[in-house]
Each structure stands twice: as C-alpha cells, then as structure tokens.
C-alpha cells in the first residue's frame, strides 16, 4: 500500500478531509477511542502490523503510524 493510499484511509477513519506526515491525530477535533481502535484495525488489515496499545500510545503523528510497517 502506498503512503498516499494509507493516508487516504486514515483520513476516512478520522473523518477528516486529509492527513499529512505531521498530522497529530490525537489533537484533531472529535478524537475518540473508537477512532483509535479504527487506526489499530487499519494498521493490521492494510499493513499487516499488529501494534500493542503501549506502542500506540507513544505514536504521535500519522507519519509515525505509517513507519510502523
């Protein structure tokens, strides 16, 4: 999956127009645990990355999420 495709899917999960490397997803209006779960599922289903909650809590940006593959 390309970075652009991943970012498009992340934007869908976060219910925003678009995201970039530097988007701090936890700072977005409406951020909630349901979106956190959606990002974890997206990582596993699309990138094959299973991230534990402790690691997820240290990730701050969308670029860092993509770098987990």
Where do the protein language model's features map onto the residues?
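Phosphopantetheine-dependent thiolation modules in NRPS/PKS and related acyl-activating systems
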Residues: 1-31, 40, 46-69
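Two-component histidine kinase catalytic core, primarily the HATPase_c
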Residues: 35
């Amino acid at each position: 999956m390309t970075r652009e495709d991943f970012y498009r899917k992340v934007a869908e999960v976060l219910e925003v127009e678009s995201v970039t490397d530097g988007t701090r997803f936890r700072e977005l209006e409406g951020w909630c645990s349901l979106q956190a779960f959606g990002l974890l599922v997206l990582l596993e289903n699309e990138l094959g990355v299973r991230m534990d909650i402790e690691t997820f809590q240290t990730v701050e940006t969308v670029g860092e999420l993509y770098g987990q593959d």
